[in-house]
């Protein structure tokens, strides 16, 4: 899955499909590694940047481990930083009169002038940067004082916090009605075409009624 030859193949595939206006689905998130580790990181990052640069339409990334055979919540948190960095890279550089800030350069002047105290610097630093959420960015003394944590440690803390505190937004009544209508249409279709028997449908409805 993480072989560089696959990246070359997918890049060519994406460009041909873009030429003909065909959407693509690239499997960025499926490394050969069996657990969250260095191999998983470089295989995923390498695939993600190349499929992004070559114009892939849909590029699933988060959580995949060992091809398409397993999923790890911890890996998903680590992958979120890969996705963020690749996304920021693909956004590119904004070159405008405001970002060039020639008037500020003239105003501040040469040494000992600096730009650190300017609102313009703070504004564009925040927009241009991507701050990873699970990376170790401390100085060496800070790293020692914090317990020598690795990216795996930070990702595990973030994962546990998300699991403990996340509250998904509930569906509206209209959304629930729409979903039920779509499911009813699908059930009717599969029964009509013989893909679901009456006995299977009865067992399915009984399971729904019991809440299992």
Please identify what each model-predicted range represents.
Residues 74-212:
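Catalytic-core signal marking the mid-to-C-terminal active-site face
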Residues 1-82:
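Glycine-rich anion/phosphate-binding loop at the beta-strand->alpha-helix junction
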């Amino acid at each position: 899955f993480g072989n560089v030859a696959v990246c070359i193949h997918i890049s060519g595939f994406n460009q041909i499909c873009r030429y003909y206006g065909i959407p693509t689905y690239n499997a960025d998130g499926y490394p050969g590694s069996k657990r969250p580790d260095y191999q998983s990181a470089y295989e995923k990052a390498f695939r993600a940047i190349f499929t992004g640069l070559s114009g892939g339409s849909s590029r699933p990334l988060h959580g995949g481990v060992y091809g398409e055979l397993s999923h790890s919540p911890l890996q998903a948190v680590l992958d979120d930083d890969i996705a963020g960095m690749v996304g920021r890279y693909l956004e590119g550089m904004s070159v405008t009169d405001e970002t060039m800030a020639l008037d500020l350069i003239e105003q501040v002047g040469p040494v000992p002038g600096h730009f650190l105290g300017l609102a313009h610097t703070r504004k564009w630093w925040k927009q241009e940067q991507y701050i990873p959420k699970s990376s170790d960015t401390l100085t060496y003394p800070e790293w020692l004082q914090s317990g020598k944590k690795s990216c795996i440690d930070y990702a595990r803390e973030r994962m546990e916090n998300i699991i403990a505190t996340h509250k998904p937004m509930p569906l509206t009544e209209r959304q629930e009605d729409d979903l039920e209508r779509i499911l009813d249409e699908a059930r009717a279709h599969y029964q009509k075409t013989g893909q679901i028997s009456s006995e299977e449908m009865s067992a399915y409805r009984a399971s729904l009624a019991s809440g299992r």
